[in-house]
From Swiss-Prot:
The lineage of its organism: Bacteria, Pseudomonadati, Pseudomonadota, Gammaproteobacteria, Chromatiales. Its main location: membrane. InterPro entries: Lysozyme-like_dom_sf (IPR023346), MltF (IPR023703), Solute-binding_3/MltF_N (IPR001638), Transglyc_AS (IPR000189), Transglycosylase_SLT_dom_1 (IPR008258). This is Membrane-bound lytic murein transglycosylase F 2. Residues 262-450 are annotated as: LT domain. The N-terminal domain does not have lytic activity and probably modulates enzymatic activity. The C-terminal domain is the catalytic active domain. The active site is at E308. It is found in: Cell outer membrane. One of its GO terms (biological process) is peptidoglycan catabolic process. PANTHER family: MEMBRANE-BOUND LYTIC MUREIN TRANSGLYCOSYLASE F. It catalyses: Exolytic cleavage of the (1->4)-beta-glycosidic linkage between N-acetylmuramic acid (MurNAc) and N-acetylglucosamine (GlcNAc) residues in peptidoglycan, from either the reducing or the non-reducing ends of the peptidoglycan chains, with concomitant formation of a 1,6-anhydrobond in the MurNAc residue. Its EC number is 4.2.2.n1.
Amino acid sequence: MRTWIAILAVVLVLLLNACTDGPEDGPRLEHPDETGVLRVVTRNSATTYYLDRHERAVGPEVALVEAFADHRGWTVDWTVAATTAEVLDYLEAGAAHLAAAGLTHLDSRNQRFERGPAHTEITQQVVCHRDRTDKPRSPEDLEEVVLKVTAASSYVERLEVLAERYDALTFQEDQRGSEQLLMAVEEGRLACTVADSNIVRLNRRYLPHLDVTMDLTEGQNLGWYLAEGQERLAQQAFEWMNSRAGDEVIAAMENRYYTYVGEFDFVDLRALKRRMESRLPRYQRHFEQAEAETDMPADLLAALAYQESHWDPQARSPTGVRGMMMLTGRTAESLGVNDRLDPEQSIMGGARYLADRHERLPEHIPEPDRTFLALASYNVGRGHLLDARQLARDLGRDPDDWQEMREVLPLLSDERYYPNLRYGYARGYEPVHFVARIRNYRDVIRQAFE
């Protein structure tokens, strides 16, 4: 009797597992030409798909897929998987037409799926802090450096191969993802790490002390994979990606997400002081008027505007934001800004937006923490800040204390945490640096408003 009960229990567990979320085998998907819908599986990361501060899906893969679908007259139905393995499971089960998840084209994958077009060439790169004097420039030099790399990654496989040739080469596997390890290098907490070149390029925009010392591999292709039986769709994808229109979209994607900005002079005190003399006087009264309406301090607004545009009313970025406060068209419209290039309107719009972020935070949060959290929300989006505050509670940290939150926010890009967050992946180190720079600027700018 107990044997039959055990068998029934196993069957019940299997049935329950079959009902859980995840890919399910089923009829092959109809072609998007017939349904008008392209079903795509991806994963959360800065190089694939994430929600921006306005909770819009953005990312390199999003830009390419949406352009391809728009060219064909289709809409896109996105599924976000937790891991690369889960992405491939969805595709193998026929739950998606296409996987666009920063996938390296590999022989093993080519045997399982219909290979789609490649869009990005990468290499694995060794990255160290730029002030380090003994940077490794060759495999032999790696014997003198203890590397930390993401556990169970392609980096581990490559280093294991090299370790067979160089006996003194050592490395440690770490549960943190590439972005977390790059941040540790930036902050001087880690000597060197290894990451894909596209991840490095993207993060150097915000982590200016990273230095690529050598390539560990030759070029590898990132691209799409399609479900078995989707040969016609694969051909359409190849034709579009290799067309002039496809080339233009790839170039725009490269410019938006990967162009290296570097430090330039956003940390240059001399440049700031020059602009305080040459530019700030033209706009100071607008900051003061915005303070009168919103109660946001004029010197804080001036520091925010300097961070956003260096007080350039004609500023624009590849992402489509424009003006002194670098507002999107939709945000500007919601704030009553008719002309984003009008500095008075732009400053008032940015002040209203920051005031809204401030007012939406609990009143019990003391200053200056409430203002710092409002700035973080301004930068990364309210949804992602709410995720970070909940994560802080889960970790036993204080969500009202900025010193605590500046350590929690970067975890929004940690794959140990973001799959379980409502708004998913975010480059959580960005708001930390954003707030720090504004605080530094404000300390200098304050004298002009006293």
